[in-house]
UniProtKB/Swiss-Prot annotation:
A Pfam family assignment: PsaD
Record function comment: PsaD can form complexes with ferredoxin and ferredoxin-oxidoreductase in photosystem I (PS I) reaction center. PSAD may encode the ferredoxin-docking protein.
Region described as Ferredoxin and ferredoxin-oxidoreductase binding: spans on this chain: 141-149
Induction: By light.
Quaternary assembly: Interacts with PGRL1A and PGRL1B.
Further comment: After Mass spectrometry, it is not clear if Ala-45 or Glu-46 is the N-terminus of the mature protein.
Transit peptide as recorded in UniProt: 1-45
In-chain residues carrying the UniProt-annotated modification Phosphothreonine: 48
Native organism taxonomy: Eukaryota, Viridiplantae, Streptophyta, Embryophyta, Tracheophyta
Entry membrane topology: Peripheral membrane protein
Source species of the chain: Arabidopsis thaliana (Mouse-ear cress)
Protein name, entry field: Photosystem I reaction center subunit II-1, chloroplastic
Length: 208
């Protein structure tokens, strides 16, 4: 991913209605050294042709059959917050930033992961944050205190949107039929081979 020159970045988000991956044309550059500012985001929806949809289709293979990743609507309003979320940092211009969305049954106050309090709107909310961990922290708070489900996405500078969490539609601590275990061995730890038998082989006892 090419690093963009330092300058003013005027963001204009464009979404493509694909099955798993959308394109957002997010950054355009104007050369002005040692100056950095963000203008109000202008958002417009854009249709994609069938060939673009076919090219994006393989990106959804990770999700189990029957689950369709939710589409990010950039027109979703943000919570009411008078402070700062810490900005998107310089990383957002050359790497990525993160967007978390949720639906609230009413207007209520919540704690921001970056500090301070904000008012979530009744209905859909969208919040841009610089780090994935901030989305996870806020999402945990939403689920534990407010009983609200959430989703978050990664947005790249070239406009691509990647759906991140929950990956298959079910939060990780819940059982989900069809979910494949990672590093799963159907045996107890006591049935692993003796570590001395695999010493100097480059393998671990749980690998056998």
């Amino acid at each position: 991913m090419a690093t963009q020159a330092a300058g003013i970045f005027n963001s204009a988000i464009t979404t493509a209605a694909t099955s798993g991956v959308k394109k957002l044309h997010f950054f355009s550059t104007t050369h002005r050294p040692k100056s950095l500012s963000f203008t109000k985001t202008a958002i417009r929806a854009e249709k994609t042709d069938s060939s673009a949809a076919a090219a994006a289709a393989p990106a959804t293979k990770e999700a189990p059959v029957g689950f369709t990743p939710p589409q990010l609507d950039p027109n979703t309003p943000s919570p009411i917050f008078a402070g700062s979320t810490g900005g998107l940092l310089r990383k957002a211009q050359v790497e990525e930033f993160y967007v978390i969305t949720w639906n609230s049954p009413k207007e209520q106050i919540f704690e921001m992961p970056t500090g301070g309090a904000a008012i979530m709107r009744e209905g859909p909310n969208l919040l841009k944050l610089a780090r994935k961990e901030q989305c996870l922290a806020l999402g945990t708070r939403l689920r534990s205190k407010y009983k609200i489900t959430y989703q978050f996405y990664r947005v790249f500078p070239n406009g691509e949107v990647q759906y991140l969490h929950p990956k298959d539609g079910v939060y990780p601590e819940k059982a989900n039929p069809g979910r494949e275990g990672v590093g799963l061995n159907m045996r107890s730890i006591g049935k692993n081979v003796s570590p001395i038998e695999v010493k100097f082989t480059g393998k671990q006892s749980y690998d056998l």
